[in-house]
Amino acid sequence: MIYCKQSTDLICTLKNQCKSVKHIYQVHAQIITRGLLSLHPSSASRLLTAIIHTFNSLLPPAPQRPPHPISYHYLHSVFNLISSPSTFCWNTIIRSHTLLSLPENALFFFIQMRRRCVPPDAHTFPFVLKACAQLNELSVARTIQCQSIKHGFMRDVFVCNNLVRVYCNCGRIGDAYKVFDESVERDVVSYNVILDGFVKGREIERARQVFDEMPVSVRDATTWGTMLAGYAQTKHYDQCLSLYDQMLVLSVPHDNVSIVSVLSACGRMGELEKGKRVHDHIRRSRIQIDSFLCTALVDFYAKCGSIETAQGIFEASPDKNLFAWNAMLVGLAMHGYGEMLLNYFSKMVKNRVKPDGVTFLGVLVGCSHAGLINEARRLFGEMGSVYGVPKELKHYGCMADLLARAGLIKEAMEMIESMPMSGDVFVWGSLLGGCRLHGNVEVAEKAAARIMEISPEDGGVYSTMADIYANAKRWDDLTKIRRLRDSRKVKKNAGCSLIQLDGVTYEFIAGDDLHPQSNEIYLVLNAIGQHQYQMG
């Protein structure tokens, strides 16, 4: 009786008083010194399982938890002391390894459990399926599904939710939806998992269908945030902002995913005032601006032309990661602040933030817009040798654009011909644009020929060559290029523009007189034209 009471007391201590792994070690030492492991096997098993269970409860969230060899070696040694592990014991050690992001070990223990003919229960399969989701292990997941059906666990919401998650992670969205559709019970996680699967698969219409079918009372911040992120990622910015307006009407709490998605849409749509209101909400709610939100705010204000505000937010943020630096650099590049951009790049390097391909894309674009040719040459040359960043087609395209704009057509052509990969439409198009600017017909013809090979349906190249021939007064060639365009039945894609009237953003194309707001649009455009004329 005394040993039994000691055993019970120590289990209570483990559950209620252990606040660190060190405390667990201390209780474990007491169990050994008091000889409690020599008790009846079932009592010893309860104690050892309680140790593992308490260990699991002390593990921090997965992103903050790199697997540590001491952790799982200790857990293994404790588990191996259990003579006849019960289903609960096996479930506990399997869960330990999913929590430690060691899914292979979790599956190993599950296999050992089945080999010993220990029956699974409703908790076993969710833990194993979490391991499958971490590994994108489709074949094992299918086996688990069969076993779940055999043991009658497919009615369990946790089994179904985790099975849907595995299928979504493996890109089997059809199988995922089938499990979701046939599930007897659904909770908010059920909807959020399949919604996330559709969003990641860029099936935004099906995602919206699930969202609309979901009871409003069941939706949580994750539901709304996932849907908003889906719209932002698939460039359905107007739908994103419309859905956000619904959130405001329903007083739905915002999470960071929602805020970032809406700021992204506002930046793309030029919705400065709406984005400012989102920023005001962040201030009123006293939401801490971490690197995630800092990046979104800097990107939004930069895209809307409010560079000083973007700078202020960036400088005030104590947590500047690579993405925040890139947002600041790209924002400066977009608006031609070349010298300032280079200063920020120097600060970034001094702060030991390693640049990546996006960083150099922003730097090269900024140098191109500001005409900083020598600086661009130097940094382009240092990408691989100094910073270890491989040059991609987009970087060569930026250099081609910079050199061609500056009239260095020969240098641009030599660079393109020496590239380790074939040029794409962007690279050759940059060269062609420079040729039009500087009237180099010979190189323009070579660039145009390559573009026609790569993208025969591109109508813009014919228009550009027509302009080049017209400027050079080569009327016969102008006639030939137009006939070639007509014979190939190539049409130039109409460009579109965006304009705001009374707070509403409208999209239109040149010469559009069918738009319901065409009169108001052209009045605004005329006013812009007059203002530009007055400003010189």
Language model: regions and residue ranges:
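Terminal (and in a subset, N-terminal) low-complexity or junction segments at the ends
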Residues: M1-S96, L100, E104-D187, D196-V216, ...
